[in-house]
Amino acid sequence: MFVDSVEIIIASGKGGPGMVSFRREKFVIKGGPDGGDGGDGGDVYFEVDNNTDTLASFRGTKHHKAKNGAPGGTRNCTGKKGEDKIIIVPPGTQVFADGALWLDLITPKERVLALKGGKGGLGNAHFKSATKQQPTYAQKGLEGVEKCVRLELKLIADIGLVGFPNAGKSTLISTISNAKPKIAHYEFTTLVPNLGVVSVDEKSGFLMADIPGIIEGASEGKGLGISFLKHIERTKVLAFVLDASRLDLGIKEQYKRLRLELEKFSPALANKPFGVLLNKCDVAEDIDTMTKDFCTFLNLKVQKLEAFDLEPYLGFLHPKLMGNFEKDLNEKSALFILPLSAVSALNTHALKFVLLEALP
């Protein structure tokens, strides 16, 4: 299960205490002070690791603390610095403190200092003076810093699936990727985003995100609302998954309502490159006519796509996806319109190649 938000407590280490000691050497009756300083407490860092893509590892591990600094030693030896705490997070993790965004961690291998460890205390060697030749005082180390933070992950996926509840998004991602989401015939089966790795061939693939179904008013927080719309903000291409079998709400109306919610939430999100998947085509009435009408609705010309092993074969592919033009994905037109069936795997194999070509 994908965990997208978690609260943890981070703490830097306490500085080690300074040492009270005096030189003890043969023939030296009253050796001077030689107490060393305490070691600094360990720091807390966040490090971005491209090999992890969830916050699931934080479940059950709430406290993350660096080690304390070691006490100062004799003969002016400084105590060892406390071991740093390195907190590994996936790319795209945002760290919130006191209700405000504190850190935005995007770049792989990036390491950011979050909390500095407490300073080690001074040993008694620092307190010798003309009037006090044998000081018996040393400083305590300074306390570390503790902070409660919230980690929030915006999915950084290549393809983001957008659709109403029960449109078949979870079935689709389980069919073409390694994701295994919960699937059932009722709305809001998906309660958290799912990530799936889609392997096209031995060398190519991409990451797909399935978010909980959008309902009207989602941009205002209804249903599962804004908390999940944010997950598709960083995806490269949107794939609208429409239920071609619905009689109460046609695919044109589904598309218009979904796009309206995206535009209300974020104009930038609504302007992302996109394509349309007409799911459940195997149980839809006259899918060819439906596909033609939808292409006309979007001012596109329906195509015969037998060469792509599509069955049914009517749909639309932008010329750029077929290598006729350079990939400039700033245009508003759809990149693809494809009928498919996630349940019976109709056209799902060809879909992998289409989605790969759609990526910038």
From Swiss-Prot:
Mg(2+) binds at residues 170, 190. Its EC number is 3.6.5.-. This is GTPase Obg. Transmembrane segments: none annotated. Residues 1-156 form the Obg domain. Keywords: Cytoplasm, GTP-binding, Hydrolase, Magnesium, Metal-binding, Nucleotide-binding. It comes from Helicobacter acinonychis (strain Sheeba). The lineage of its organism: Bacteria, Pseudomonadati, Campylobacterota, Epsilonproteobacteria, Campylobacterales. Pfam families: GTP1_OBG (PF01018), MMR_HSR1 (PF01926). It is found in: Cytoplasm. Its main location: cytoplasm. One of its GO terms (molecular function) is GTP binding. GTP binds at residues 163-170, 188-192, 210-213, 279-282, 341-343.
